[in-house]
Amino acid sequence: MKSKVTTGKGDAGNTKALDGDAFGKNHPMMEAVGTLDMLRAQTALLRLQLQEQYPGELPEINFLLYLSHLYFLIGTTISDPYIRKPEWRRGEIRKEHLLRLEEEQERLESELNLPQSFIVSATDMVAAQADITAVCARTFERRFVAFSEATPDFYMPVCLAFVNRLSDYFFVLGRHLEHGRGEKAVARAPA
């Protein structure tokens, strides 16, 4: 039986982008798409952990699903930077997406008294997963910037701002999840 997943076309170290062009798997575009996929998977894991720990409706669960859908908008923007395949594009990150992300972070942060020092460790698995997701968001941001710098005429300031806010959101979400159980993250001790 022939696999529907394995094609063997990437065995030489190249892969095709959405726009049809072939790139090395270490090209800035592929690095950006790959780290975005990692962010998507970590966001999904966090969402599933929240569903398991908080049966019923928790607004954060729905918001994480919303973010996951937006990751696909970002991915198609990166994979087709010159819009050669508009039929595959479902839109792009707009100001209203950025505002919704900022509003959600502000909602969570308004209920917190954040520590004045660096966080050494989360206090439970779900908050730790939020921290891992924040790290993935920062990694993706670096790859997105590298791709932007390597791609002439690719300038997406709203998308870049959105990507920049993601790690802040996940950090605040982690602290919010700890606060909701009366726990606080382990802050760095003074030297």
Q: Residue ranges of each PLM-predicted region?
A:
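Phosphate/pyrophosphate-binding loop motifs in nucleotide- or prenyl diphosphate-using proteins
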Residues: 1-191
